[in-house]
Amino acid sequence: MLGVSGMQPRQLAAQILNFALVLSTAFMMWKGLSVVSDSSSPIVVVLSGSMEPAFQRGDLLFLWNRGLDTQVGEIVVYNVKGKDIPIVHRVVRRYGGGKTPLRLLTKGDNNIADDTELYATSQSFLTRKEDVVGSVVGFIPFVGYVTILLSENPWMKQVMLGLMGVMVVLQRE
């Protein structure tokens, strides 16, 4: 008995399980990085030019969230309440620390003004513990550009997923 494209059912099942193994391995690696870095998003892609020349659009950033004592000049990734896209900017001022919660003011290197306009409506600073996803500890230039292309061209995502599915089904062991 032959299945999809002349494959035996056992071969087809093996291919599907192989594909599931690849996906689950990637997921486990992501979760492992999240635990080690103490960050919900241990890797992010720069989506705009607001941090040029330090980081270009498409750079892949690695985050670390273990040290809660963020200094002025440090580059952090933060989430704004009510928005789902993380922002990568430099800390330009800090308030508090010690017994009082650490509050931060950020600004993009390529921006004229600080980020108070980007923060949530009732927010004039970031709370380190609640808003900051992590501090940038390393990067790989332009590797994340694939992510930008896929988000700006949704049809490319479907084509890539289709090609990956076809490759898994047609691959012979």
Swiss-Prot record:
GO terms for cellular component: signal peptidase complex. The active site is at S50, H89, D115. Its main location: endoplasmic reticulum. It catalyses: Cleavage of hydrophobic, N-terminal signal or leader sequences from secreted and periplasmic proteins. The keyword Endoplasmic reticulum applies. Belongs to the peptidase S26B family. This is Signal peptidase complex catalytic subunit SEC11. It comes from Leptosphaeria maculans (strain JN3 / isolate v23.1.3 / race Av1-4-5-6-7-8) (Blackleg fungus). The lineage of its organism: Eukaryota, Fungi, Dikarya, Ascomycota, Pezizomycotina. The gene is SEC11.
